[in-house]
Amino acid sequence: MAMSEQPQPVAGAAASTTKARTSFGILGAISLSHLLNDMIQSLILAIYPLLQSEFSLTFMQIGMITLTFQLASSLLQPVVGYWTDKYPMPWSLPIGMCFTLSGLVLLALALVGTGSSVFHPESSRVARMASGGRHGLAQSIFQVGGNFGSSLGPLLAAVIIAPYGKGNVAWFVLAALLAIVVLAQISRWYSAQHRMNKGKPKATIINPLPRNKVVLAVSILLILIFSKYFYMASISSYYTFYLMQKFGLSIQNAQLHLFAFLFAVAAGTVIGGPVGDKIGRKYVIWGSILGVAPFTLILPYASLHWTGVLTVIIGFILASAFSAILVYAQELLPGRIGMVSGLFFGFAFGMGGLGAAVLGLIADHTSIELVYKICAFLPLLGMLTIFLPDNRHKD
């Protein structure tokens, strides 16, 4: 159902005739902070096999660990985003990272989730502020840091944690401290930008589509996020167990396969935003979610070699969707950048946590292989993209 309406950016009465420049230094810094934040979180996922063997955990219990910190982040992110839309808080970035640091020291995963709930909406806002109008590119730079950080977790677990014990997780407090320093510098820039814009007349918010169409479009985007992150939960939480049980791999070798998948996710993120800027976000979303379906359907029946190849392809294609989905949603709801970012990051985290818990329950009562056979059909929900308003906007 192609529609001529398209999301447009905010229109203002006092629009500047000079095009803003992209602040690549700020984008690089916020991407580095995202890398450090998500590396810490992925490290928790990566040591699951060690925790399972030491504490005799079931898959359901492992899923509940994921749900604990993901749910804390999921519930708080939209609230944080909504509040900071009304009352910008530049210094919330390093403060949020302090929660993550505390959670790592105390092994309190809910605190790690709380820190993430503050970090993601405000960091996404900073990326948009620094974009110079190249919103897809800016979101991709921001996202690739997080995805590359996520890929480092299994690698570091294989090299440092598995051989020398889980007590070495404490060393990664240094990563949180570095992130706090970087975020403090970003907060200074954010504060300066806020002061510069304070005296300027506020732009008039023009909603690009009727309310009912916006609600429909956002609902479809959230369903697509559900399909993406439920599937991602099957890989991030249980891929190592799948490889160990089906193919007899060691923990270290299984972690290296997980690293390859997550590295492909990071690479795919780079593509989604800039391509969406050029050809339209809807087409990137369509190709990313639905386009991965043939590979997910084949995966449960593949040999070890082809399992590695297919998961890399799946990670690369699937990852290109999120930047396009987020910017598309921000264009649907101009003036609500923080709330939209919080809603979509929070929903993504929530679906990841819920997916881990539900899939863990299925694995306990059936088998880990059945989990991948069920999840293989999730990308078919990408067919709903046809009902999105046709977005021909190019930055």
Predicted regions and their residues:
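Residue-level signature of mid-helix packing/kink "hotspots" within the transmembrane helices
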Residues: 42, 70-78, 150-151, 262-270, ...
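Extracytoplasmic gate region of multi-pass secondary transporters
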Residues: 44-45, 216-262, 266
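Conserved MFS/SLC helix-loop-helix module at the cytosolic interface between two early adjacent transmembrane helices
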Residues: 75-105
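Helix-to-loop junctions at the C-terminal end of transmembrane segments
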Residues: 76-88, 269-280, 363-364
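Cytoplasmic helix-loop-helix junction between adjacent transmembrane helices
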Residues: 109-145
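Helix-loop-helix hairpin linking two adjacent transmembrane segments in secondary transporters
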Residues: 142-192
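Flexible cytoplasmic inter-helical loops of multi-pass small-molecule transporters
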Residues: 185-208, 395
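C-terminal transmembrane helical hairpin of 12-TM major facilitator-type secondary transporters
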Residues: 276-325
